[in-house]
Each structure stands twice: as C-alpha cells, then as structure tokens.
Amino acid sequence: MQKYREQITQIAQDIGFNDISFIDAKPLLKSEQHFIEWRQKGFAADMNYLLKENPINARPQELLKEAKTIIMLTANYYSPCPPRPSLEHGRIAAYATGLDYHKVLRKKIQELINHPSLEGIFKNSKFFTDAVPLLEKSFAKEAGLGFRGKNTLLLSKETGSFNFIAEILTDLELALDPLSSKAVGLEGCNGLRVEPFSPSAIEPPQGHCGKCTRCIDICPTNALPNPYQLDARKCISYQTIENREEIPQELHQGIGEWLFGCDLCQTICPYNRKHGDEGI
C-alpha cells in the first residue's frame, strides 16, 4: 500500500492539489461536541442542513461503512482581486469569480481515482467537496494540513486560507501521516514563536495566530465575537449567500458593497498577504 500512497500523492500534486494527507477514518468526537455547542448558541442561523441532528458531521462511517482511511486534499484558489471599475460596482468573494469549484474538484478527484497506474484500487470509495455536512476543516486540521485561525478558517503557513477542501473515503488501509506533522513549528501572525498544535487538544486550538486579531477587528458586522468563534447570523457571507429572508437593517451599513460573500477576514490575514501565485 505504501507504493499506492506515493503514487496517489504524486498524481494529486500533478493535477493541481497543493497538499494531501492520509489519516485514520476515526470519528472526531471532540470536534463533534464543539460543533454541537456552537449550534446550540444559535450561531448556525437558519442553515437547516447544519441544524439537524446529523451523525455524519464527524463520523466517516456514516458515509462509507467500510471506511478505513480518509485522503484529505486541499486546492488553493487564491487570485489577485481585479480593481472595481468604479465605486458603484459591488464586490464578490474570490471563490465565486471562477468556475463552480464543486464541478472543478469533482473532475480532478475523478481523474485521480481513475488514473490507470492505480489499477482500480478505489472500487469501494466515496469522495466529497463541500457536498455533505462533514466537518471538513476539522478533518483537514487533524490531517495536519493547517490549523484553525481566529477567523475559524483552516490556515496553512504555505498557502494561507484560500483553499478548497476535498476528501476521499476509502476502505484501503493506506500508510497514515503522523498527526499534525505539517503544522509543527509555525510562527504566529505577529512573529512570535508558538507551540506546535496538538491534535488531541480540545477545539478550538489556542495558538498559531499569536496576539494577532486583524480578522476580528476588520469584520464590519462583528461576526467574530471571540477568537475561533463565528456567528453566522452576522456574517456577510451568510447574509448574502445563505439567508433567504430580508437582511436585518442593522447589518446594511456593515455589508456595504458586498453582493455575494466576503473575503475581509482572509485578505487581512498575514498568512494570505504574502502569496503572489494564482491557485487552481
């Protein structure tokens, strides 16, 4: 299986995924509890797919009973935002400026699992990208592909937070990556050295961002009431994408020119401001 793992890694990188990790398909019970507590505070707003009592969230075997390994993948989508023609033009989130990422990533994963050199080993597998209520950020963090930032997004020292997350659940027993192996020895946003993230720690992990609060400070609707905590009811992305009702009057000024989504808590992050190459 080690041979296949090396082949999978090389193929994934060749077709555009910037990071890949193999982890045990075990339930993330601490992440599940953290999610339940977040939901109980009303922070999920009226997103019904998050409000349901759903065991899928942190339990891979609910999606694939025979799952033994999860192959976690990330694909960077950073692209310099073109200047608006005038102040009368609105703004949209970076991920929405290109093709439908669900279709793009599904095509790439199909190219990966159907690659001739893999000899059809993915016969009993399922793959997803933001299509089921799986705690993708938690599994990606568990796989060592990054750490949870104060804006609640998955942050990678190499590629920042402008990353799509995808996963392949399989019955293959592939060699597993040491947990958090890719998240050790990072520096905080303010340059301070911080302790490596321990995947066994109760979420949310404290660290890596140091004393930096730029993402919290820049949010015009105060959607980040505390570090590592998002109140979707006040989030511009929720209000302009998910909300099917009238946007509350008190949020109008903060939303401003945003028409679809928002990137403020990402573009202000020092981990994103250093990137110059366009992503997938």
Segments (PLM) and residue ranges:
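Iron-sulfur cluster-binding cysteine motifs and their immediate structural context
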Residues: 214-237, 244, 255-280
